[in-house]
């Protein structure tokens, strides 16, 4: 999926759109990338002399990745997905300008409109962040 297809699936726009490309997608698994550049607005304040991507934005990028997976399904194309929670979140590596986040999300449980995914973000094959994310699919 290119950026136009991602924008067709997600309601997010600059500066909050944190998925640049989807590399692979199946019924319950997705791999996407975020190219992190010094031009990201959050680097102005986090931190001016030592730019590091905020962990919460890494988790948001993972949530958006899972959102693309859910919203690309035919039955969900006109719906919104709401981030309902996260558990077991771990940050293992700082993400800095020039890094490419490779993000994966795999659905592990569904019940009605609620879905749970295992998500990971890696840089150069090393784990940067991971967690279990919960979503609610709205109307």
Swiss-Prot record:
Subcellular location: Cytoplasm
GO cellular component: cytoplasm; membrane
Pfam families in UniProt: FabA
Active-site feature positions: 46
Keyword Phosphoprotein in annotation: no
A molecular function GO annotation: (3R)-hydroxyacyl-[acyl-carrier-protein] dehydratase activity
Catalysis: reaction(s): a (3R)-hydroxyacyl-[ACP] = a (2E)-enoyl-[ACP] + H2O
Top-rank taxon: Bacteria
Role summary: Involved in unsaturated fatty acids biosynthesis. Catalyzes the dehydration of short chain beta-hydroxyacyl-ACPs and long chain saturated and unsaturated beta-hydroxyacyl-ACPs.
NCBIfam families: fabZ, PRK00006.1
UniProt similarity note: Belongs to the thioester dehydratase family. FabZ subfamily.
Protein name: 3-hydroxyacyl-[acyl-carrier-protein] dehydratase FabZ
């Amino acid at each position: 999926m290119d950026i136009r297809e991602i924008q067709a699936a997600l309601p997010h726009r600059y500066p909050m759109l944190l998925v640049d490309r989807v590399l692979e997608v199946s019924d319950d698994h997705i791999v996407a990338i975020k190219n992190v550049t010094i031009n990201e607005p959050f680097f102005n304040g986090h931190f001016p002399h030592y730019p590091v991507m905020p962990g919460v934005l890494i988790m948001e990028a993972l949530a958006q990745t899972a959102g693309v997976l859910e919203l690309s399904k035919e039955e969900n194309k006109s719906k919104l997905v709401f981030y309902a929670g996260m558990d077991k979140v771990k940050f293992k590596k700082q993400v800095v300008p020039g890094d490419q986040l490779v993000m994966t999300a795999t659905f592990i449980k569904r019940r009605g409109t609620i879905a749970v995914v295992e998500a990971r973000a890696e840089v150069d094959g090393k784990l940067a962040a991971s967690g279990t994310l919960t979503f609610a699919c709205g109307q």
